[in-house]
Amino acid sequence: MSETSEDLLRNVAKSLTNERFKLILFPTEQCNFRCLYCYENYQLPKMSNKIVESIKLFLDKRIPTLKLFELEWFGGEPLLEKRIVIEISKHAKLLCEKYNVVFHSIMTTNGYLLDIETFKELNSIGIKSYQITFDGDRENHNQFRLLANSKIGSFDKIWDNMLEIKNHCELDCVITIRCHLTSVNKASVQSLLKRIQDTFSKDNRFFIHLKEISALGGQDDDKIQHISREMKQIVVEELKNEYKELSFVDIGKDYVCYAAKPNCFLIRANGTIGKCTVALDSEINNVGRLLQDGTIEMDKEKYLSWFQGFDNLDKEILDCPYYALKRKGKF
C-alpha cells in the first residue's frame, strides 16, 4: 500500500467516524463587503433568537457523544453578528469541557472587523484559527474586495488588524492568509508575499495558502481572468521557491472535502441544513432543517447523495462532491 493511499484511507476514516463532528454555522448571510467574484446573494438576515436556542439544544444532544467537535463560523461575514458567535461558542466550549471533548473552532472572515479586542475575546472562547483573504497587493486587492456601503477598498484596515495581533498579542492562534491567484496577478501576489515575508515571517502563527479564484456563479465571474489548474501549479511552485521564509499550507492530494463527509454539515441563518458552503441556492444542497427542539429533520435521499465518493473512493468526488457529481450527471 502506498503512502498516498494510506493518507487517503486515514482521511476517509476520520470522515466516517461518529466520534468526530464538524458543524459550520452562518450567524448571518449579510456581508460588509461586495467582492467582485462573490457567489452569495445576501438574502438571509441574521439568525433569530429561536434558531440560536435550537442550535444550543442540538449541541446539548450531540456533543456528549463525541471525542472531537469542530465549530466553524462562516457567512456572509460572521463578525457582523459577534453576539451570536460568542453566545453559541461559549455554550459549545462549556459542553466540551463538561464532557471532556476536544474543541476546535475556526472562522472564515474578511478580517475587517477583527480588531485586537475582538480577537482576544474570540480567543478566550476557543476560536483560535482564522482564514483571511487578500487579492494581491493593496492596489489589486482594493479593486476586488470592496466595502458594501462605500465601494472603497479594504486592504489597509485588514492589514492593520493583523499587525495589531502580531505586535500586541501573544495568544496562540493560527492565521491563514489566503492569497488569490488569477492569470494576470502574479506580480501583485509577489508584492504581497514580499510584504508579508518582511512583516510576519518570524511569527509562526501566520501561514500562506495560495488559491485560485474559482468561477462559482458570481454575477461578475466573466470579469475575472481565471488561471488554469496547470498554470496555477507552476505559479505556486515559483512563489514557494521565491519566498522560502514563509510557511505555505496546502490541502494535499488526498484531501476529503467537508461536504463529502457524513460527520459534517452546515446550518444556515434560517435553520436550513446544507452540505456545501458554495452551492447555497442548489436544491440538492437543501438536505434538511433544524427543528425548534434541537432535533434534525433530514431528507435522507438528498443527504446520502453527497457521500457517493465513498462507494469506490473516487478521489474526484471526495475532493469536491458538488461539481464532480454535476459533471457526472448525478446531481
Regions found by a protein language model. Name each.
Residues P262-L280:
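Active-site and channel-lining beta-strand-loop segments
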Residues C31, C35-C38, C257, G271, ...:
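Short cysteine clusters
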Residues S2-R20, L239-E245, I251, L290-L304:
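Short, charged low-complexity linear segments at domain edges
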Residues L71-W73, M107, I132, I177, ...:
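Buried hydrophobic side chains on well-structured beta-strands
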Residues Q30, P78, Y112-L113, D137, ...:
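Short, solvent-exposed loop/turn segments at secondary-structure junctions
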Residues D135, E139-P262, A269-N270:
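Radical SAM enzyme [4Fe-4S]-AdoMet core and its adjacent flexible, acidic
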Residues E3-K120, I125-K128:
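Conserved alpha-helical substructure of the radical SAM core
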Residues T277-F331:
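Flexible mid-to-C-terminal extensions adjoining Fe-S/redox cofactors in radical SAM and related proteins
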